[in-house]
Amino acid sequence: MTSGKFDVCMPFIFREEGGFTKDRHDAGNWTGGKVGKGVLKGTNFGIAAKAHPELDVASLTQAEAAKLYRVEYWNACNCDLLASGVDLVVMDVAVNSGVRRGRSYRDATAPIRDAQKRVDGMSDKRRAFYKGLKTFSRYGKVWLGRVARIQAAATKMVLAGADKPAAAIKAELQARAAQAHAGAAKAKRQAAVAGAGSGAAATASVSTMPAPDQAAHPTVFLMLLAVVVGGIVVALLIHRARAHRELASAYAEVAAETN
């Protein structure tokens, strides 16, 4: 039974990790863990030369990679003991962000008995984590897409584990896609309103700016503060809209595959 759970989850992990890459600018592709240090061997099925300098990465088979994933991630996070769907999310967190974080998310959500709420909660934690990374502006879309696809796949597993018929599962996934789409539209509208307000505040702060000897006037400070806060709010709403769009797309895709 446990082997079956692992086998069900791995196609989703392999889909996200991809095949063989040998980008010399990626530190993970070097056996020394830094660009130019050691031998450039690359990454295959997500198994990197940095973590496994002893391997012939290029000739690694998917079956061999699966064995490594089972020991280093699946077993390390005790995924066999987790509910269907929850196991996939914890596994993907461990693979993409480290075993320590995978265990942390697993333990933090352990009190949540509802498997779907646990899947959603961990997925939200992932988005918040990625949003805080300095490289989010470059890789954010990729990360949010991955989180959404794993969340949607995990949701289907949860529903299937509840012995719901395919038609009911499809309907639930479609409903979630519609809900996420509506959430994206709402966040987009809110961002537009907040952006307009921030722009108005900026215009007002310039037009009402006092003489140079009064530059520290409280009114100027408050107006500038309003502009800064408005900009932060807009950025957060744009992030929310993007996350909802990715999730809507992922749910729609999984629903289309459900018959």
Task: Write out the residue ranges for each language-model feature.
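Cell-wall polysaccharide-cleaving catalytic domain and substrate-binding groove, primarily
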Residues: 1-217, 221-230, 236-259
